[in-house]
Amino acid sequence: MAKKGSGLLVKLVSSEGTGYFYVKKRDPKKLVEKLSFRKYDPVARKHVLFKEEKLR
């Protein structure tokens, strides 16, 4: 079987403060700045900005 990529798992936390988060894999070699996405937060029931944090 093929090896899994050497991607880094990061947590995308809602800026709304609901505690909802997504987990995403990213390539540490390509990206220098932190990720931020506008995604759906089901707790807030709207699209909000999600910012990258370290996954513990």
From Swiss-Prot:
Belongs to the bacterial ribosomal protein bL33 family. Coiled coil: none annotated. Keywords: Ribonucleoprotein, Ribosomal protein. This is Large ribosomal subunit protein bL33. GO terms for biological process: translation. It comes from Anaplasma marginale (strain Florida). Pfam families: Ribosomal_L33. GO terms for cellular component: cytoplasm; large ribosomal subunit. The keyword Repeat does not apply. It comes from the Bacteria. GO terms for molecular function: structural constituent of ribosome.
